[in-house]
Amino acid sequence: MSHKPVAVLVGPPGSGKTTVGAALAERLRIPLRDTDQDVEALTGSTIADLFVERGEDYFRELESEAVRAALDSHGGVLSLGGGAVLRPETRKALGTHYVVWLDVAVPSAVKRLEMNVARPLLLGNVRGRFAELDRARRPLYAEVASIHMDTSELSVEEVVEKLCAQIPSRPKES
């Protein structure tokens, strides 16, 4: 297997990176790697705890290292945290990869996220915080994206179907 991801998923919280990533990897019979999980495994802490105890800058440094390592060694589907694109070095590293920007409209994202307390940047007014993060990150997602897909009104299966039709040099499905 290649040591370059077949697809790198980016997008805001609630866009489906984790769920779509798992379904896409299963469909293509390749491994899924999630850099948020890599950071949690490395530190033994949750992302939320890292934000509270060490701050966002510390987390972003660990995240950047996790992304770099995964881009160099993972040959499956790679899911990045929503803020991974904030670092210029990460955006530069993504330049040679097939990057899928999974997008979601604010109402759909809020519906998906309201019950998730493990997202430290969305505590409080979920709709307002999401809209604020989305405005700041949208140009960065656009900068790195090979394709853009709005998941707001699509099922996981529909997203996976569309991605399978568009991913270049993907493994043959069985």
Model-derived features with residue positions:
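A glycine- and Lys/Arg-enriched "phosphate-lid" helix/loop adjacent to the NTP-binding pocket
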Residues: 96-139
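Conserved lysine of the Walker
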Residues: 17
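Hydrophobic anchor at the beta1->P-loop junction of P-loop NTPases
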Residues: 9
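ATP-dependent small-molecule kinase phosphotransfer cores
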Residues: 34-93, 118, 127, 131
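Short glycine-rich anion-binding loops that position phosphate/pyrophosphate groups of nucleotides
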Residues: 82-85, 105-107, 154
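P-loop (Walker A) phosphate-binding loop of NTP-binding proteins
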Residues: 12
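Hydrophobic positions on the alpha1 helix immediately C-terminal to the Walker A/P-loop
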Residues: 20
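NTP-dependent small-molecule kinase module
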Residues: 1-3, 23, 27, 95, ...
